[in-house]
Regions:
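Flexible, acidic/Gly-rich N-terminal and inter-domain linker regions that tether
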Residues: 1-81
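Radical SAM enzyme [4Fe-4S]-AdoMet core and its adjacent flexible, acidic
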Residues: 1-10, 175-306
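C-terminal accessory region of radical SAM enzymes
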Residues: 36, 250-273, 292-350
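Conserved alpha-helical substructure of the radical SAM core
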Residues: 46-48, 52-156, 160-167, 171-173
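Short cysteine clusters
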Residues: 91, 95-98, 278, 296, ...
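Residues at the N-termini of beta-strands
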Residues: 97, 127, 150, 176, ...
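Iron-sulfur (Fe-S) cluster-binding segments and ferredoxin-like electron-carrier domains
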Residues: 100-108, 300-305, 337-369
């Protein structure tokens, strides 16, 4: 029987969650320990847990034992609560704006994938984003769900019609399915993705996912190829009653290539808010398809090979993060660093891509205005 709830440490507290649900409940340390004991010894689900499940999610868990009903995640001394994982690089689309550049289908074998997920669980990862490439081409993430992780799957949606995927997501409901939308017409969609039939596959997948009641969100990707359809894309998402967000500012490839920047719609670019810091490398990390771990998707210098070093390799991430965030290179000594709009790793990518200064640096604003 699939578990109905997850009880987990989270930063300086504890949470009670329902797989696939946006709402959650904070619980006391005593309640967490009580659930932990009940699950270990096969005791009935505590009354407070049954009441919380009823109040928050409308669940009737009367008469259930804690074991099998709740996944109680163990405390971790590593301090990580979120992670992202490129399960593979392969993709059935060839999007012009993709930050991965080349996309060969490569990644870990099944046993090493399970080992990586075990490391993530033991490191404390509760929220896991699985991306690619196209992750639904390689749907080996049931173990992550069974380990009590809240999964976000980032997908192009083209395969969501497949019965095996629909069953997987219904049996193991994700926290969210984030689907990228590349146009509101066949012409623009197929042009940006560089694949004939991509629009039809996207529509087929979205229709099946909506009918299955999956927790969808649409990222409306606005580029030069589909800029004239930006409003129409958002309107379609609204018509489908799917939460949506416009994505307009592209970043260079992870190898420092500027190709994605050429795909941007200049009329739709947004000025970023000042960068106020983040927890990359401290409470969050990113794993590539071969379990090479970095502080995030952007700052990939000094990767740690988890298959070679194991979980203790993560103890070096904080030091790496602090070093990568230093204002070095062309940013060293900048008097405007307090209001800089990008982190140092992202600025480095822009510099390597020889991007126009105003696209990432305040010093370029006057240059662009003139």
């Amino acid at each position: 029987m699939a578990h109905a709830l997850i009880a987990s440490p989270f930063l300086d507290g504890h949470l009670l969650l329902k797989p696939g649900a946006r709402a959650g409940a904070r619980i006391s340390a005593d309640h967490y320990e009580g659930l932990r004991q009940a699950a270990t010894s096969g005791e009935p689900l505590p009354a407070w847990a049954m009441q919380t499940a009823s109040d928050v999610w409308g669940l009737d868990l009367g008469g259930r034992t804690a074991q099998g009903t709740v996944v109680v995640r163990e405390p971790s001394g590593y301090g990580h609560c979120r992670a992202s994982w490129e399960i593979n690089l392969g993709c059935n689309f060839g999007c012009k704006h993709c930050y991965l550049g080349e996309r060969p289908f490569s990644g870990l074998g099944w046993e090493d994938k399970v080992r990586l997920l075990d490391i993530m669980r033991d490191a404390g990862v509760l929220w896991l984003q699985i991306t690619g490439g196209e992750p639904t081409m390689d749907p080996h993430f049931r173990d992550a769900w069974q380990a009590g992780m809240m999964l976000t799957i980032s997908t192009n949606g083209s395969l969501l019609w497949r019965p095996d995927l629909l069953r997987l997501f219904q049996d193991c409901p994700p926290y969210r399915l984030v689907v990228s939308m590349y146009g509101a017409s066949e012409a623009s969609f197929d042009t940006l993705t560089q694949r004939r039939g991509a629009w039809k596959a996207f529509r087929r997948g979205l229709k099946a996912a909506r009918e299955a009641g999956l927790p969808l969100r649409i990222n409306v990707v606005v580029t030069e190829d589909n800029a004239s359809e930006a409003a129409e894309m958002a309107a379609l998402a609204d018509e489908w009653n799917v939460e949506n967000h416009a994505y307009t500012n592209m970043t260079p490839t992870i190898y420092g290539g500027g190709e994605p920047l050429l795909a941007q719609s200049a009329a739709h670019l947004r000025q970023r808010k000042p960068f106020a810091g983040c927890n990359a490398g401290h409470t969050f990390f990113h794993a590539d398809p071969h379990a090479k771990v970095s502080i995030c998707k952007v700052g990939r210098d000094d990767q740690i090979d988890l298959m070679a070093e194991g979980i203790d390799g993560l103890t070096r991430l904080g030091t790496i993060a602090d070093r990568l965030m230093l204002r070095t290179g062309g940013c060293e000594g900048c008097a405007l660093s307090g209001t800089c709009r990008v982190c140092r790793p992202l600025a480095k990518h822009y510099q390597e891509a020889k991007a126009q200064l105003h696209s990432y640096c305040q010093h370029g604003d006057k240059e662009n205005a003139s």
